[in-house]
Amino acid sequence: MMVIPLQAVPSQAVTVSLGGQNCQISVYQKSTGLYCDVYLNNSLIVAGVLCLDRVKIVRDAYHGLIGDLSFVDQQGASEPEYTGVGSRYLLYYLEESDL
């Protein structure tokens, strides 16, 4: 398991190597919650996924990502919002062995 470094801003994109895979993760706040898009090798694999506490983001292996992503509330079980991203709400990369 690995924490992906994010900042408490309303919209951001990070590029990171996850299990040897080139990934870009976009995280953005809307009025209805925090959302995420995931690119694998510059190809969009999931878009507009509502980020929920301890719920996988990619969910299906057929998308090609080895492992998965999930936000975890460090202080309880609230749904993530951008003001706490990077401190209260951490984005984890879950390796295959973590699933």
Task: List PLM regions with ranges.
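Compositionally biased, intrinsically disordered low-complexity segments enriched in polar/Pro/Gly
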Residues: 1, 43, 76, 96-99
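Short, charged/polar N-terminal "headpieces" of proteins
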Residues: 1-26
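A broadly conserved detector of short glycine/acidic/proline-rich loop/turn motifs that flank catalytic sites
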Residues: 10, 29, 95
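A general secondary-structure signal for short beta-strands and their flanking turns/coil
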Residues: 11, 31-33, 86
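Residues in well-ordered beta-strands of folded domains
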Residues: 26, 72, 92
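Acidic, aromatic-enriched beta-alpha/helix-loop junctions
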Residues: 31-75
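Short, compact, well-ordered microdomains
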Residues: 79-99
